[in-house]
Amino acid sequence: SVTLDKDTRITRSQAQKILLSKISKSQQHASNTISPIVFSDLVSEWFQLYTKQVRSSTAYTVKGNVKLILEMVDPDILVSKITTSYIRSKFETVMFGDRNISTTYARSIRTRLKSIFQYACEHGYLTENPINNFRLPKKKENVKQISEFFLEEDELNKVMNYLETHNTRYWLFCEWLYLNGLRYSEAAGMLKKDVIISEDRNFCKVTGALDYAGKKADEIKKINQTKTIASLREVDLNSKAVEIYTKACDLSLNSEYIFSTSTGTPIHISAIDTFLREHKERMGIDKNKKLSSHIFRHTHISKLAELEVPLHIIQRRVGHQNESVTRDIYLHITSRAKDKTKKLLEMI
């Protein structure tokens, strides 16, 4: 309330203005009032909501980010006390200290933190996101050679020949990845009914992916979700791919999946990647080269680039909208082809 000495039209008007001003300040103060919460509780709240919005495999991956975030930031600090400079000091520690995380990984952590603090702003724990004005510190890193991402022709032959004689199921699976440029989860989750063989056209339909992250063998199954919208696609099969499909089906008679273990469960990524890693040197592959199931997808891209298939066609085939690795491999291969052409011209 407002009390003035006189009761006139002018003083009543003044009183009304003063009262409205007080109400406005009171409301502003109320809107600026934030609820106290410690950082670990905020992260827990955010992650609980996040897991309901994404695929379980994505949530499983992000769980690793969350673990590092809780090591970086004091879990008991009040969120309202966190500043941009505080965040910067924490990133400097994990990027340049014993942790020595890469810029790429730091970027994903920054993205996750920004989402967490945005949640805090929207739920009354913060008035401003401390990540908004934060830029990652620059870090000098060794540039990876593009050739590390795919197998050369001789390397591919060494791997496939070894797999064919040492593990038939893995050989068929890796051939399928290479011939069709599929992701592990797309190929491992592909059902026999997803492949269409006809006189007019042979193709496989990518309609989902294997949901495997953090699950036991009997819990793993295909879900009708893919990494991106572009991942939903039909992939044409050549004659060799059809042959691989037929052989794989003969080995998985007791399963609806094209590729399975002897017990009928889908092939697990950790099993096949461990096999590739442990047998790499016996295959004749350089011990420093990273060999995993994903390299066959990149090798498929490199082969299409060698065949001068346009980049946008390659991206559509492998289910990429705008993937830097695909583009880098393409440019590397086409540049190498141009250099080879120049040398051949000198022989004319």
Label every model-predicted segment.
Residues 107, 122, 126, 132-184, ...:
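Basic, Lys/Arg- and aromatic-enriched nucleic-acid-binding interface segment
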